[in-house]
């Protein structure tokens, strides 16, 4: 029910780049799945990351340049069925931080008072996955074919594999910088 409700809500938004949304969501979920044991995340956190991935750019309908903050507001106030109030707050925070963590935003959302420290730590981790996925598709060209996430006792490693038109995608990204 939750996924259907989020998809229905998303379909009402005048967003244009659905491929980017699906792609970023898939990359974030791939990282979650590969590093899940390290962070000891329950299944429901994966679901919330999935929902946040679908909603991460919703705020663009209000203001492109501060869309992460607006995505959080829209997610927190959307009439979406299938999650608890706490889960809606968690998802809103994940969308808020998909361009980096902000203590200012965390303090400005009064509903965060219902969250535990562990839940806020999970939000930081999940939003980091979403932020990394977003940065891997900054040019909206879907140039990455696969991410392989590994770890050692002292590091987390990510190997990025490019797909079709790899060189052209890299040139496009370099020119845009």
Regions of interest found by a model, annotated:
Residues 158-171:
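A short interface-forming secondary-structure element
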Residues 6-11, 20, 29-149:
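Divalent metal-dependent catalytic cores for phosphoryl transfer on phosphate-bearing substrates
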Residues 16-17:
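Cytosolic transmitter module of two-component histidine kinases
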Residues 172-177:
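Conserved small/polar residues in nucleotide/adenosyl-binding loops
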């Amino acid at each position: 029910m939750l996924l259907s409700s989020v998809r229905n809500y998303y379909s009402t938004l005048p967003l244009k780049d659905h491929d980017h949304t699906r792609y970023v969501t898939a990359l974030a979920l791939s990282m979650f799945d590969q590093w899940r044991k390290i962070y000891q995340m329950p299944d429901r956190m994966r679901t919330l990351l999935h929902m946040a991935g679908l909603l991460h750019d919703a705020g663009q309908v209000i203001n492109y340049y501060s869309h992460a903050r607006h995505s959080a507001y829209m997610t927190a106030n959307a009439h979406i069925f299938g999650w608890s109030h706490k889960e809606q707050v968690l998802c809103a925070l994940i969308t808020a931080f998909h361009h980096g963590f902000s203590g200012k935003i965390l303090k400005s959302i009064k509903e965060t008072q219902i969250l535990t420290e562990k839940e806020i730590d999970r939000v930081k981790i999940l939003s980091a996955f979403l932020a990394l996925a977003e940065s891997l598709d900054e040019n909206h060209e879907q140039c990455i074919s696969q991410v392989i996430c590994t770890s050692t006792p002292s590091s987390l490693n990510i190997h990025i594999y490019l797909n079709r038109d790899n060189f052209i995608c890299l040139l496009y990204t370099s020119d845009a910088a």
